[in-house]
Amino acid sequence: MKQTPTPHIGAQYGEIAETVIMAGDPLRAKMMAEKYLDNPVQFNNVRGMLGFTGTHNGKRVSVMGHGMGIPSIGIYTYELYNFYGVKNIIRVGSCGSISKDLNVGDLVIAMGACTNSNYAMQYELPGTYAPIADFDLCRRAAEAAEKFGYNYKVGNVFSSDTFYTENAHNDKWMNMGVLAVEMEAPALYMNAARSGNKALVICTVSDNILTGEATTAEQRQNSFTHMMDVAFSLL
């Protein structure tokens, strides 16, 4: 029996498409629905976490917010994969560059996600798990970014449990070739792996931690559309 609605998603089973494109900010999800979806229908507003289902170029797709941080995206993506029959989740969001080769507005396609989170402890694994994206989604995203002519890099991100921290150790992650910092990818990738489904994170560089270059909240909400173009091209 399908356990829907869930405590955090008010939709009935069947109201959410098999592919969901997610953003941390629910207003960004609303913007995606207005910009990319034909005939969008809202399926969720529980806790203000807006979700919509419609079509894009004739293909059914949903968009939804996931909030900030690993615990929040962990809850929403677990419910989507395990209770709503979702097969593919693509997160589009912002990240901070710790690479000399990435500027504000560039894309990061997260092939893997390093983390200081204990999210994997729930699985009681006899070692350290390496959260990675689905290869096919990752490959096609890189091909799409190339076709669009967008500046992008494919590689590892570091996903932190803390936004404000006493010592971020960004130099150490940079020395390991990590491209950028965000806060959600490992939970999404682990939930996808555990449920036998697919996931990908595509981020836009909102600030460069090395140079201090940054963007406004309004810019992050409304103007980071290149990553969305890539995400919707994967349908």
Segment roles from a protein language model:
Residues 116-119, 165-167, 208-212:
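Short acidic/His/Gly/Ser-rich catalytic and metal-binding motifs that mark active-site loops
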Residues 140-148, 191, 230-234:
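Generic non-transmembrane alpha-helical segments
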